[in-house]
Amino acid sequence: MKLLVIAIAVFGLAADGPLPDFSGTWKQSNEQCSPKRSGDVTLKIEHRDPKLVVETTAKGRVERHALQRYTTDGAESTSTGADGDEFHSSAVWKDGRLVFDITEIEDGKRLKSNEIWSLTDEGRSLKRVRRTEKAGEQTLIYVRIQ
């Protein structure tokens, strides 16, 4: 019986496979986003599970930068967005995807959202499905450039 339990546990771990590594430099593919986006957004990601560091650069009329530090173990992290808003986030793995619960504090209001990150196109694209109270569902696609 013990051998059966061990075999099931080992098989279950093998079936899940390795978790995605989001490390790299990613450029937003405006045409693939839904709804379509404009602007020039780049993510530089360092991912050494459970640590995840995301540097966002958005170029437009004004260039903006943001640095977020997360852990993938469900611990809450606090960061400041490119627009100066405060974010409280937690992230956990679920079915090989990274699931974020986010609370944004904007003008004293608490706005809740969530994101699901996954790699697609054999790891060449990062897909972020974002659900927010004010904007509904958005799908952001980033293409690996490095």
Predicted regions and their residues:
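Hydrophobic small-molecule pocket/channel-lining residues, especially in calycin-type beta-barrels
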Residues: 16-146
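Sec-dependent N-terminal signal peptides
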Residues: 3-14
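Serine/threonine-rich low-complexity intrinsically disordered regions
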Residues: 1-2, 21
